[in-house]
Amino acid sequence: LQTTVVFTDLHGSTAVFEALGNALATQTVTQITTWVGQQCVLAGGRLVKTLGDGVLVMFADSQDAVNAVVEIQRAHSARVMRSPPNLRMPMRIGVASGEVEMVAGDCYGDAVNVAARLCDLCGPSQIWANAAAVNTVHEGPGLTLRVLGPITIRGRAEPCTVYQIEWHE
């Protein structure tokens, strides 16, 4: 199955658990991950699963995936800026297109691994994508692509050409 995989992660959630305690922090994180999943589904994605403070979503169309994560990043970043500094959890997002295998509602494959690694590697409030995810994406106001170059991704022999999706309006 050819698809675009989106992996999101909340940066700084460990400190929020320390500040708020388990119950309140869990509620806060769950509200955000639920919202991310809903936004992706509304944009045409399929929620595969949430994993703690992360969300894994598949999109049939890479432009839909990129548009969705740009809107999510804009809305979430605005919310982060209104939060007290010790409760800020900016989002990191990795996007990768490629082949995946579906097994019992879960997805496996290179694109899943690359999206997860890009999510780990990018900075807070950033979106990183592989070349396959952005090669048909239309840039416009508030959505530009900046090539970061070939980046070595753990577990892969070949470096991966990575783009940063600039989403600031």
Label each PLM-derived region with a short phrase.
Residues L1-A68, A75:
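Catalytic NTP-binding/metal-coordinating core of nucleotidyl cyclase/transferase enzymes
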Residues M58-E169:
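Catalytic beta-strand-to-alpha-helix segment of the class III nucleotidyl cyclase homology domain
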